[in-house]
């Protein structure tokens, strides 16, 4: 499993909130075209924003990098922030499945 991680640190925490909505709306458009397995967007208290996207193949990750560039370029023209990115492979991940396992009888 491959990952692309974007760490953005905004000057103003309110800018990070606005940007998180923008990213959620616009990066979701790449789920199908880039065969994305998951995406998470996290907002930290002091204007930090982290976006993590998972892919099954390196070529899907590269496609996402190319296609999503315009989304990040749009934000750069609107807000002041510092951005660091890296691509990597998952070594360990755990996610509990949200499913009700009880049966209620009436």
Regions found by a protein language model. Give the residues of each.
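Short S/T/G/P-rich N-terminal loop/turn motif that feeds into the first structured element of a domain
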Residues: 1-49, 54-70, 83-106
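Outer-membrane beta-barrel domain signature
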Residues: 72-79
């Amino acid at each position: 499993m491959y990952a692309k991680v974007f760490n953005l640190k905004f000057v103003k925490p309110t800018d990070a909130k606005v940007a998180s909505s923008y990213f959620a709306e616009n990066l979701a458009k790449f789920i199908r075209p880039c065969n994305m397995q998951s995406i998470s967007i996290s907002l930290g208290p002091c204007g930090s924003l982290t976006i993590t996207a998972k892919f099954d193949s390196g070529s899907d990750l590269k496609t996402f990098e190319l296609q999503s560039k315009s989304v990040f370029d749009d934000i750069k023209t609107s807000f002041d922030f510092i951005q660091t990115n890296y691509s990597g492979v998952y070594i360990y991940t755990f996610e509990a499945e949200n499913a009700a396992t009880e049966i209620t009888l009436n």
